[in-house]
């Protein structure tokens, strides 16, 4: 029978493997080819990766706004209000959650994590809103 420690260790290993699957995450969130190419060309250079993430965040934010407007155009007044409330709450959560990742004591890696969190959350929400228009 495994001890709590062994189970915890196994959980950490599985979690670590899940974190190291950016191509799957990128495909799931519908990242652009420009982003994937940019990240590949960055060769792990933090400044270049930051530029790639910033550019893709702008593209994903535009996609999110487009999907939000499209969904709003299909909703009744009551449902529009519900979506506005939900979207405002989501923005607050995303900002607070991703700010937590940007630990000022964590160096450039933590800042990159915070920016990537923001990008992933925005892309996921854009996809979610797109799926709701169907």
Describe each PLM feature range.
Residues 24-134:
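N-terminal alpha-helical modules
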């Amino acid at each position: 029978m495994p001890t709590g420690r062994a189970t915890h260790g196994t959980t950490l290993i599985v979690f670590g493997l899940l974190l190291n699957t950016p191509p799957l995450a990128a495909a799931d969130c519908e990242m652009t080819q420009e982003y994937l190419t940019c990240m590949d060309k960055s060769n792990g250079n933090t400044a270049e990766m930051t530029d790639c993430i910033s550019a893709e965040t702008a593209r994903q934010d535009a996609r999110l706004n487009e999907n939000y407007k499209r969904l709003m155009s299909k909703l009744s007044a009551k449902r529009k209000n519900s979506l506005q409330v939900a979207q405002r709450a989501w923005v607050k959560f995303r900002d607070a959650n991703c700010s937590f990742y940007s630990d000022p004591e964590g160096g450039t890696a933590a800042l990159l994590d915070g920016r990537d969190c923001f990008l992933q959350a925005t892309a996921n929400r854009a996809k979610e809103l797109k799926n709701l228009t169907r």
